[in-house]
Amino acid sequence: MDVYSASVWPRLEPFLLGALQAAPPGKLSVHYLRKMASYVRTREGCFPRLGWHMWRHIACGKLQLPEDLAWLYFETFDLLAPRSPEEKLEWAEALSQCQSPRELDRQRSKLSVDTLHFLLFLYLQQLNRVSLRTSLIGEEWPSPRSRSPASFSEREAKASSHNKNWDDQAHLTFVQTHLTEILELLAEPGELSSSGQPPRDGQLLPAALQGLSLLLEGSASHGRAVHPLHRLLGRAPFQTQAGYSKLSRSYSLQKLQSWLHQALTLNPFGMSTCLRSGKKLAWALQVEGTMKRAKIARNTHLAPPGSRVVLMSQLYKQTLAKDSEKLADANVKLHRCNEAFIYLLSPLRSVTLDKCRNSTVVLGPVVTSVHVQSCESVRLVCVAARLAVGASSHCTIHILTPTRPLLLPGNVALTLGPFHTYYPTLEDHMASVGLAVVPNLWDKPLLFGADGPTPDPASYRILPPAEFWPLVVPFQMEGDTCEVPGGLPPTYQQAVEAREQRVQDWQKTVKDAHLNKEQRRQFQVLVEQKFHEWLLERGQRQELDSLLPAAVTPSHPTDSALSTCGSQPSLHRPKEQAAQRAVGRTPTVC
């Protein structure tokens, strides 16, 4: 190997979190992005930073995109910008004080993004573009589906269920295939021929390489330190190999492209490597009678920030509860979990639920996004900067989020409800990642179609207050949070209070009946019997039973397993923790 060789790979974060998990509008094709690249360089207020008002002018006036969609892309890119928790909380407070659309627009006008980075972010939306040829080849014919004409939404949902956001091989292929077009967007307009193609003697300024660092990073041979691409090319040997000229202070486009093709490799911190050689975690139990073993792997012990990954697959009929440093600021993927109860009570970078069924998932605060893909009958409870749901059915999602929930194609019978739980360290975790209780747009979803937001009220509903029940995290932990952050919306709070009043009225009725000791015993037996029958009818007996695994000693003092030590744990309503003793003792941390 050459002493001065380098390895370059696609960064995980822009592909995982930046590319929306649906086909982009046609107006975001490379043809229109080339025009935009030339336009922003010749207009005041567009380069090197692009403000919201100028982007809205380009998106709505030039590209004919709806304003909601223009803001979606701008906001999504801004969510990835590195900001301190204090800055995020200040921004949330400013948004929450806006009382009118005009005030909101004035506040948004204070945002600006790096223009070259934003251009590449828009180009990155091509990652999940639907290929008609691939769809036709992949569709078996004749098939039962061919007897009835499939709607466009069904075909789109099928395509979106195969999104490539976690596929590091797809990331590498995307960059290798489209490297020429990517470099075109970064080149000065004068460096392109009349056909829009870079000439053989085209040049690229070092500032453009900083834009390319959004997508690429790497390391020198025999070195473990990871550098953005422009810093890696700041080293003299690599500058020479990549065609840097000290005279023109620029790179040869042809030589740079050739060097990148030779240096590009698979991301050593991606999902493939994590599955193959990541550290395995013995957090899950193997359930008798199951064909596949639960797998949990991580690379958090060696990956740089933004590339920390924890993969959990095949969790079946068990409860997994963790508050661990191994989860902190990690990108978590839950894959094919079935009839499981999962509590990940740490600050997380991002979370993806893929092909999960009949499960409950409760998350700590998520810095960027939670994505639910191809799931069925999942109950999700989380605080997150963004929620996206695609190709999923009969899922109930309780969320606190400062952005509009993004509903992608293929959803059926979703239910959106307010965030309705807490655990003792929740508010501390929220503050540590910069998530506030306001604004909270949980009930204002944005429906995303192939050509922009398309209203489809049949795909979701807002949870009726009559069906609302608070969720109690059934583990004892140290901390100060003792109620739902921000409280419940008034109509839901009223429903809870009315239900509590009915319970109190019923208890008073029992007390006023003046039952003797034998009658009280018989009545208690009857209540317990009916309660257990209700648990079986509602399918919640398994949730209680799964809280009784054998106690496991944490492998690390900061790796807390929130397992239950009591013989029969109880789930109790808020403010009634002394009541309902029929099921047993309160679970504690082992």
Q: Language-model features: where?
A:
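Charge-rich, low-hydrophobicity low-complexity segments
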Residues: M1-K355, L363, P409-C590
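Feature marks extracellular polysaccharide-active and adherence modules
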Residues: H335, Y343-L345, D354, V362-G364, ...
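Leucine-rich solenoid repeat scaffolds
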Residues: L380, C395-L408
